[in-house]
UniProtKB/Swiss-Prot annotation:
Name of the protein described by the UniProt record: Ribosomal RNA large subunit methyltransferase H
Catalyzed reactions per annotation: pseudouridine(1915) in 23S rRNA + S-adenosyl-L-methionine = N(3)-methylpseudouridine(1915) in 23S rRNA + S-adenosyl-L-homocysteine + H(+)
Residues reported in the UniProt entry to bind S-adenosyl-L-methionine: 72, 104, 123-128
EC number: 2.1.1.177
UniProt-annotated location(s): Cytoplasm
Originating species: Mycoplasma mycoides subsp. mycoides SC (strain CCUG 32753 / NCTC 10114 / PG1)
Amino acid sequence: MKIKILCFGKLDKKFYIDAFNDYFKRLKKYVDLEIIELKEEVNGELNKIKDENSNLLLKKLQNYKDFEKVVLDVNSRLISTENLVEIIKTNLNYKSAKILFIIGPSDGYSKSFLNSFTNKFSLAKITLPHQLCRIVLIEQIYRVFKIINNEKYHK
């Protein structure tokens, strides 16, 4: 299976980098994982910034037409680990076994961007810093593969 995480910015704090690298190494056993980092537009009027960043995402997504796209959005449906297991299992069993998770820009997506996707969910109803969101997502993906493979998860 191939999983890509499309996100804005780079991990810049050692503790985030260490945590991410730990889960990244663990996941190699189960999945081909790639991180795609985009440079976020931060200057200008809020709606214009949202549009520019969303357009940048849409342009980048053209390279991944055969991937199932999953948009992470704080205002979307809250999911559990079990829900994520089903999303990944379904993709493993019935689709191309390619998933692209999208972690949006800090100011959020444009309305038109969000409206163009049906597969959206939230990891939490609290706002997470982007770097922490990336860690939570990769940890949950790792947990999912431990569950799918009936392996014990060591906390």
